[in-house]
């Protein structure tokens, strides 16, 4: 993989997770402050991530991997996503906000697989090359939290709707940038995908490996408190009076 490709993939990862980090951590606080949302409403908003993850295999397995170039699908999704994030920022109530964030997450979650697919397809030695690319996603998430808290101060000034503005702008930027990414055509196949393949059920064979089974179970258990953390931690810290809570959580 040459330096130009490596740079483009790193930028892709940075922007991909910067977008998510802009609004996801502080969404609970935003909903509480802007709409006086109940705990149930906040839970519904964060639940959209799960719905997006459920739908993602159908979009990736049935459509993106077989009929279209991955970078073009990524571009289209992020451009559309930018519009949805903007609508989230101007929504006048939770009942208006929820449909936009639900549709957005159904579109966004598949992009997590798309960016990995685009990256892996350009690599000759993924085990060594991928970590250097993927780490820029983590950096993007961290930078987003620092910008919101310490950079522009939207959290302390209770202007968290601007986090969706910023995410919308960066989403469209990534969408346009995606057209410059290395061409990643669908892998040729003459066979129609089975439902088993679309859902990735063949991957369950990996559970026969005891080490992988332990990893799988551990991941599920870890994600249970993690869901509560993202949903409630920022709101909790803000109610305690912790300054720049999103930045503190990031660090």
Q: Which role fits each region the language model picked out?
A:
Residues 1-3, 181-216:
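Juxtamembrane intracellular "pre-TM" segments in multi-pass secondary transporters
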Residues 2-50, 211-248:
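Helix-loop boundary and gating motifs at the non-cytosolic
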Residues 3-6, 89-101:
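Helix-loop junctions at membrane interfaces in 12-TM secondary transporters
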Residues 14, 84, 94-114, 118, ...:
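Hydrophobic core of transmembrane alpha-helices in multi-pass small-molecule transporters
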Residues 44-62, 250-251:
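Central cavity-lining transmembrane alpha-helices of secondary-active solute carriers
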Residues 55-69, 152-153:
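Helix-to-loop junctions at the C-terminal end of transmembrane segments
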Residues 72-86:
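Structural signature of the two symmetry-related core transmembrane helices
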Residues 148, 166-188:
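C-terminal membrane-cytosol helix-exit motif in multi-pass small-molecule transporters
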């Amino acid at each position: 993989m040459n330096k130009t490709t490596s740079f483009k993939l790193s930028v892709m990862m940075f922007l991909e997770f910067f977008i998510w980090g802009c609004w996801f951590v502080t969404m609970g606080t935003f909903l509480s402050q802007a709409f006086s949302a109940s705990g149930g409403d906040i839970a519904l908003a964060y639940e959209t991530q799960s719905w997006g993850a459920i739908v993602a295999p159908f979009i990736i397995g049935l459509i993106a991997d077989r009929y279209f170039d991955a970078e073009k699908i990524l571009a289209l999704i992020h451009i559309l996503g930018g519009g949805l994030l903007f609508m989230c920022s101007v929504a006048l109530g939770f009942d208006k906000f929820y449909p936009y964030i639900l549709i957005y997450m159904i579109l966004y979650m598949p992009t997590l697989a798309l960016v990995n697919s685009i990256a892996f397809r350009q690599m000759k030695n993924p085990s060594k090359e991928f970590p250097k690319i993927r780490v820029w996603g983590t950096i993007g998430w961290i930078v987003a939290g620092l910008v919101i808290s310490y950079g522009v101060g939207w959290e302390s000034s209770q202007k968290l709707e601007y986090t969706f503005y910023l995410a919308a702008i960066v989403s469209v930027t990534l969408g346009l940038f995606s057209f410059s990414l290395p061409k990643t055509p669908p892998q040729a196949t003459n066979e129609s995908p089975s439902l088993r393949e679309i859902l990735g059920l063949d991957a369950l064979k990996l559970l026969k490996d005891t080490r992988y089974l332990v990893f799988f179970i551990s991941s599920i258990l870890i994600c249970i408190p993690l869901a509560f953390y993202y949903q409630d931690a920022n709101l909790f810290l803000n109610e305690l009076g912790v300054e720049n809570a999103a930045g503190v959580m990031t660090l």
